[in-house]
Amino acid sequence: MLTLTPTYDRPWRQPAEWWPRLAAATDGIDPPFGVLSLEALAANAHDMLERAQGTPIRVASKSVRVRGVLDAVLALPGYHGILAYTLPEALWLAETHDDVVVGYPSVHRAAIAQLAADEKLASRVTLMVDSIAHLDLIDAVVAPDKRATIRLCLELDASYHAPVLGHLGVRRSPVHTPEAAGELAAQIVKRPGFALVGMMGYEAQIAGLGNRGAGKAVIRMMQKASAAELRERRGAAVAAVRKVADLEFVNGGGTGSLESTHADESVTEIAAGSGLFGPLLFDGYEHFRPAPAASFVLSVVRRPTADIATVLGGGWIASGPPGQDRLPRPVWPEGLSYLPREEAGEVQTPVTGAAARDMQVGDRVTFRHVKAGEVSEHLDEFVVVSGDEIVDRLPTYRGEGKVFL
């Protein structure tokens, strides 16, 4: 298993030396593959702990999708448990981990039946709910008297209803007020076959929205106001739910909100994962800057003109509102850019720039992805580099034959 030892060197701050070093270490491997710097991963993991200031971090698996990385991070004091994104994934991870919360409601009937039939799995996995309809579906799959007790987490809507701008954040739970949370909790605890053990609220408008630069002053103001509003509302909602349920945990936040979520006394743990890989998305944040721990490498397969080199693959567009900010970025060799009329393609991606003129068929281009775990869906493995050497090769979920979404 990888050991994530703290490091005080920051070689990635010299990109003209950093990227060639990683490229040289992996020169004998055929693309496409991911590259994971052990030092950068360790620095990010420890930086997140410092930012959380003692609040335990539950690792968001969707932002990693590499079991070897999950294992290494969870071995560090300060990290505990996994926030999975589907129930089939959670059941798979629960074979070796004893605390897995599914971050989204599940209606996967076969997986629910598997969970309900296994006391050990049922003790390790917690399902997310935000309405009685979720309980009804579970009961329809397996009756309460014919299954193990199902652990539940109630999700609170953590979005911000701004005075002028309206709804800010993501559309998740319909449970927005403390009153609604208390009412749903009261209904849940009356239902046989269930145990309400947790609460969750994800403040995407704070954790997932870049705020760096003079043009982002309004966003920073909104985030400050949202954090204050949520701290009061979430605290009241947790208090309302605790009147009827003995909660084991209250989960909040994400990599981008570790500081503000820690300041909420009602929160007992923070969910985070993207900061481990340090994707492009976080280059746009003012209050922290993770190391670019994860990258991916593609091969040059064509030279259509003297100014253009074409790599195989590349169109690994990040989720979210479509735009230029969702494209992977070529980072080595320096100075490469996309063609405006073609950009990143499904099977081939032409790049241009001064460096493209010197590239030959068989050369490589290193890219960074906008998001963290999404790149793992395109790769079989990450090659782990420490210093100038390959120290491990870790399969992604895809490399292990698993595709959950």
Model regions and ranges:
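C-terminal accessory subdomain/extension
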Residues: 303-405
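Active-site loop/helix belt of alpha/beta enzymes
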Residues: 158-279
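Active-site loop ensemble at the mouth of alpha/beta enzyme cores that anchors a bound cofactor
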Residues: 214-226, 235, 256-334
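Active-site-proximal beta-alpha core segment in soluble small-molecule metabolic enzymes
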Residues: 60-203, 208
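A charged N-terminal "starter" segment
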Residues: 1-117, 400-405
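Flexible loop/turn segments at secondary-structure boundaries
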Residues: 66-68, 93, 206-208, 257-260, ...
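Flexible, glycine/charged-enriched surface loops at secondary-structure junctions
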Residues: 56, 196, 243-249, 359, ...
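Glycine-rich tight-turn/loop motif centered on a GG-T
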Residues: 26-37, 99-102, 120-127, 166-175, ...
